[in-house]
């Protein structure tokens, strides 16, 4: 492993009975970046996080995290990472301040009181710091849990769906914290259900499907693999079929109809499609137009196009 990568895995495999959760996971996360790990339910995202944080042992393959071998140097890996999972590790009988100070003592943090005060302020928890955590809302507990994972300033932070269930204000606060971490040199590996979250935070995305990394790249690079969403509205339902034929021929996509609006839409398989090209093609074919639009692809479109578990992805994206 070179100093370029904070996380590097090659051929990671994990089986649970007859289920192959990971089938050769190759992942490279550059230092000081946010890597978003996306994929449909059951793709292997959480299993990958559990392996890379030493909570599970791989059946095959190798990995290095923060410069240490995942298996041979598991204790050293644990000393360099922070983890926030889908379930919080907060003690409800302790106050928020006491929880963070406890984590500070467990990790032998110098000056835990000062670091605790800093994190309480950073996560907007100062006013509630001396209340029992059992009185906190779900969003406050999630923020406190994330603060606990940062108590020792980890080199690599693993966030497994950290904003699930948070209100928009709390989610934005967490996003600001994540951006600040990378500015300080921390590497973040993030799994999330929220495609907007990955789009806004991730420098690179690893799209996991059926236990493997199917595609990698920046959000912009992945979107470039998927064409834009084109829609045409015509004045008469009688020409919908003609409009659909033009879209089919031009884009290679499968047209869908909204007959109440006399509209036909398609996700283009051609990333070079432009609105002027679309309008000219319809005009050449003699198809009258009321309106035509071309929307840039989103990560939702990337999900639907680039993963094999299409039905699951549609359910997740809904």
Q: Where are each of the predicted segments found?
A:
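ABC-family P-loop ATPase nucleotide-binding domain
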Residues: 1-13, 309-318
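ABC transporter nucleotide-binding domains
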Residues: 4-9, 14-209, 214-215
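Solvent-exposed beta-strand sheet faces enriched in polar/charged residues
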Residues: 10, 233, 258, 293-295
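Preference for bulky hydrophobic residues occupying beta-strand positions
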Residues: 14, 27, 232-234, 266, ...
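A generic structural signal for secondary-structure junctions
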Residues: 82, 99, 108, 145, ...
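ABC transporter nucleotide-binding domain
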Residues: 175-269
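C-terminal coupling/interaction segments
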Residues: 271-318
């Amino acid at each position: 492993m070179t100093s370029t990568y904070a996380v590097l895995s090659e051929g990671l495999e994990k089986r649970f009975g007859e289920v192959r959760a990971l089938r050769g996971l190759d992942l490279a996360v550059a230092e000081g970046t946010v890597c978003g790990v996306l994929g449909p339910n059951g793709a292997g995202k959480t299993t990958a996080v559990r392996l890379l944080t030493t909570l599970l042992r791989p059946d095959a393959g190798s990995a290095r995290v923060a410069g240490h071998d995942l298996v041979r140097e598991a204790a050293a890996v644990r000393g360099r990472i922070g983890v926030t999972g889908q379930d919080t590790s907060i003690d409800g009988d302790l106050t928020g301040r006491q929880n963070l100070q406890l984590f500070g003592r467990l990790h032998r943090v110098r000056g835990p009181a000062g670091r605790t005060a800093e994190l309480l302020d950073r996560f907007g928890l100062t006013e509630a710091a001396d209340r029992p955590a059992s009185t906190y809302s779900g969003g406050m507990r999630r923020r406190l849990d994330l603060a606990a994972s940062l108590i020792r300033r980890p080199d690599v932070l693993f966030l497994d769906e950290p904003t699930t269930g948070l209100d928009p204000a709390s989610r934005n606060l967490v996003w600001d914290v994540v951006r600040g971490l990378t500015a300080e040199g921390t590497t973040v590996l993030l799994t999330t259900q929220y495609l907007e979250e990955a789009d806004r935070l991730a420098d690179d995305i690893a799209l996991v499907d059926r236990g493997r990394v199917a595609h990698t790249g920046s959000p912009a690079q992945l979107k470039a693999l998927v064409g834009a969403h084109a829609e045409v509205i015509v004045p008469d339902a009688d020409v919908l079929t003609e409009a659909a034929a033009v879209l089919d021929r031009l884009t290679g996509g499968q047209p869908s109809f909204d007959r109440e609006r006399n509209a036909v839409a398609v996700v283009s398989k051609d990333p070079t499609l432009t609105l002027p090209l679309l309008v000219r093609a319809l005009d050449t074919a003699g198809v009258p137009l009321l309106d035509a639009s071309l929307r840039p692809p989103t990560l939702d479109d990337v999900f639907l196009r680039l993963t094999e578990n299409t039905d699951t992805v549609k359910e997740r994206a809904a």
